[in-house]
Regions:
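N-terminal small/glycine-rich loop or linker at the start of catalytic domains
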Residues: 7-23, 76-89, 112, 117
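Active-site-proximal loop/turn and secondary-structure-junction residues that shape catalytic pockets
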Residues: 22, 53, 79-83, 117-122, ...
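Short, acidic/polar
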Residues: 27-39, 92-108, 156-160
């Protein structure tokens, strides 16, 4: 496994991370334990969850699975999204953050969170309040690093500039939606992160499975797959996208790799990507994703792939 620095920090995370939004739901406790142990054996040390995944059950499942293994992982979780029906059960206020960090620590059965991420921007809470609270959590030792998620470039820039002026800890990472067919991040987020050394953590790297190549043009989606009923996956099922996947699948296979490995390797070729967060519901998914860390695209290969993606 390859390890990379998490943005402008000394923390090293595995190039392939483990996404756990289905843990505690579709993935039961037995499978969670198997997947987590298997991921650690493969060298994956970065695990990402959130307080809202499966209404907190993802964190609970991880807390059980990671007993005796905390020294082998870097745990990331998130706050801001609604966790209840009360008026203060959401947002980036000091009240909600302080309440929820304690709840996450209880569910995870640990005394600290390695990377605490703001799940989205909060228009209702003064940024100063949010950042001061996060700085206090780092000072207390309950949180070691902070990150953002689903932020625009101007929001990330404003937050880190304010943190610099006030002497508070900055966001070291940004977790946003980014893959071969979702490239909006290349307009502003990626240039900003490259310039200011903020680590990028792409999520949904396989476009819900479409970038594995398992969905075939003109064929029904496999029974039980997301492609059967997920609008997110189905929106990628266009002739133009099938053309690209078919070409890239053949290109990858000529080099002894799969389309899924190429989708990960392409993200890892981006300069500021620290870790690609790959969700898994089976150990075999983790094993397949981990192989991508060993494939470093050359500049020429990267250009060839971009040529296909750009329709050249």
């Amino acid at each position: 496994m390859q390890y990379r620095l998490l943005g402008n920090s000394g923390l090293r995370v595995s190039a392939i991370g483990l996404g756990t939004n289905q843990f505690g739901g579709k993935v039961d406790q037995l499978d969670t334990a198997q997947i987590v142990s298997g991921a650690i054996d493969l060298g994956i040390n970065f695990i990402d969850t959130a307080d809202i995944y499966q209404q907190g059950r993802s964190e609970e499942a991880l807390g059980v699975a990671l007993k005796g293994k905390w020294d082998k992982v870097i745990m990331a979780t998130k706050v801001v999204s609604p966790t209840g029906d009360g008026p203060n059960d959401k947002g980036a206020s000091r009240y909600h953050i302080m309440q929820n960090v304690e709840a996450s620590l209880r569910r995870l059965q640990t005394d600290h969170i390695d990377l605490y991420q703001m799940h989205r921007w909060d228009n209702d809470t003064p940024l100063e309040e949010t950042l001061r609270t996060l700085d206090d959590l780092v000072s207390s030792g309950k949180v070691r690093y902070i990150g953002a998620s689903n932020y625009a470039a101007w929001q990330l820039a404003r937050a880190n500039l304010l943190a610099e002026v006030r002497g508070w800890v900055p966001f070291v990472s940004i977790q946003n939606h980014y893959h071969m067919f979702e490239r909006e991040q290349e307009r502003e987020i990626i240039p900003f992160c490259n310039a200011h050394n903020v680590g990028i953590l792409p999520f949904f790297p396989l476009a819900g499975g479409f970038l594995t190549g398992k969905y075939k043009r003109g064929e029904a989606a496999p029974a039980g797959s997301r492609g059967e009923n997920s609008p997110y996956v189905q929106k990628y099922m266009t002739d133009a996208n099938y053309d690209k996947v078919e070409k890239l699948t053949a290109w990858a296979e000529e080099r002894g790799h799969t389309m899924g490995e190429l989708a990960h390797a392409w993200l890892l070729a981006q300069p500021s990507v620290s870790s690609v967060i790959s969700g898994a519901t089976k150990l075999s998914h983790v094993q397949a994703n981990a192989k991508a860390a060993d494939w470093a695209l050359t500049a020429e290969e990267f250009a060839e792939v971009n040529g296909v993606l750009n329709g050249e």
